[in-house]
Amino acid sequence: MRKRLPFADRTRSIISAAATIFAAHGFERATTKQIAEAAKISPALLYEHFPSKEALYRAVLRSLIKDQDRLVATLAVRRPGGTADGAAELVMMLYSYFSACIMANTNELDVTAHRLLLASLAGDGTYARLLYRRALRKNVNALSTALDNARANGDLTGETLAAATSASFIEHVGSMMLSTHLLEKPVAPYADAGAELVRKAVFFCGRGLGLSDAAIARTYPADCA
């Protein structure tokens, strides 16, 4: 006879199964029958834990947003050694973020949240809006300061971009690179891979922000150049 899981454990099991189904099919096309089958329970038991698909979706979002915070955290600007070297802050942020995106499978990063983001973008956008607002709220002020410092130091030139716009451009590049690396064999025909692809992405977006090649080269992590 199969052992009955405690209520809390069963709830977590349902949320985990639902996350996989929502990520694969999106909110609109996912069904409670599919979720119940993935969780290996009856639809009736599913409704004992969650009164509706909407309630279950909200529970999944609350759970996955914590996992996605790990990736969002790599977009945070940090001050190396307590200095006000804006270029160094920006380059380290780009390096950390693109490394996390490109090495997702190698580092065993849980990409369920990212798959759900893609499904949300193809659907009603609820989760995508939540994630983008959350990421911006956490990072935009530090990014703005780093951009200002880099410009004041002469490392960043050209048209001034709003920090929110810069953050969105960077996220879009990283997000698509992560998307192409979700499978065991990357689907995008990049000429480079691994650490070299990270380096090229840093130079690409660093130049887009207005950083000079000299500033990027000077501040790129020495053991990764």
Give the positions of each predicted feature.
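N-terminal intrinsically disordered/low-complexity leader segments
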Residues: 1-9, 72-81, 215-225
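Hydrophobic/aromatic-rich alpha-helical bundle segments in the mid-to-C-terminal region
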Residues: 2, 108-110, 114, 128-140, ...
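Helix-turn-helix
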Residues: 2, 13, 21-63
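Hydrophobic alpha-helical connector segments
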Residues: 59, 73-112, 163-167, 198
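Alpha-helical bundle regulatory/interaction domains
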Residues: 60, 70, 78, 209-214
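A short secondary-structure junction motif
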Residues: 67-71, 75, 108, 120, ...
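Helix-loop "lid/cap" segments that line or gate small-molecule binding pockets
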Residues: 96-107, 115-123, 204-210
